[in-house]
Amino acid sequence: LAVFLAAAAMVGLTFGQLEAADKYTLRIGTSQTDQAFITRAYMTLADRLMEKSGGRLEVKVFPAGQLGGDEDILEQAIQGAPVAVNTDAGRTSAYVKETGILMMAYFADNYDECLKVTQTETFKKWEQDLATKHGIRVLAFNFYDGPRHFMTNKPINTPADLKGQRIRTIGSEVCVESIAAMGATPVSMSWGEVYNGIQSKALDGCEAQNTSTYPSKIYEVAKYQSKTGHFQLMQALLCGEVWFQSLPQDLQQLLLDTAREVGAETAAQLVAASEESEKAMVEAGLTVIEPDTTPFKEAVKPAYDKLGFTALREQLYKEIGKTK
């Protein structure tokens, strides 16, 4: 019996050593700078996963487009590469169109409304479709980077002021149609090129959130901010379903739980971070304008009709108990 127990113990030790030796690495790519709010959130996630997994799951964060554009990273993830991308509903709409409504102008008024939408059975079904039909695993859809505003070199008080203005926006159909409906000429280019684009006058401005415009120093080349808050930027962390299923079940659950945990924590910190960024930009010379947003909201209504989102918007409002 003693010999059997000793042998069993040796076998158990061997399997334990093999299990401990199974280490996994995930690379997260983002277009934002290393000082951006969302990048620092993913660095927090990396540290926490390393600690909680006992070193079995290592996450490395690559800012400033080091892994390529969002679409390129997502395609790599779908093919099975151990990569994840920080992105938004505009990108996921290329696979499941309906998810894009979360990134339509003036769809939601704040983070809480966006979060409620992601918790509906309708949205959960879309996430399942991303996984089963397109090979995309949503690790978390509750990261938040705040409302987006126009950054330009002329005051924007009404949609008419946007006419003829070449404004950089996210290169997804929902964003392009929203910005066009408000009167601007939407231009798609990587975030890392925006500063030079405005400086060289290839762009007249951009639309983005404070926690990106400040670390990217957009206020140096765009002197006005119009606080339209047209997009509420919910951020998603996406990886490939193939890679996700290659993880042991305990690490799968740990990754999901921790990503959502950090997403919720950082969302709670966003308001203060956004206000600090705005204050710093104003101190550097930025002029902030707070226009009446009613004309902008009216202007984007045709975009909902054009994309077939009007009925879907009403359905989701009903699901989350939102009144117009």
Predicted feature residues:
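Short, low-complexity disordered leader/linker segments with a strong preference
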Residues: 1-25, 324
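N-terminal secretory/targeting leader peptides
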Residues: 20-114, 122-124, 128-324
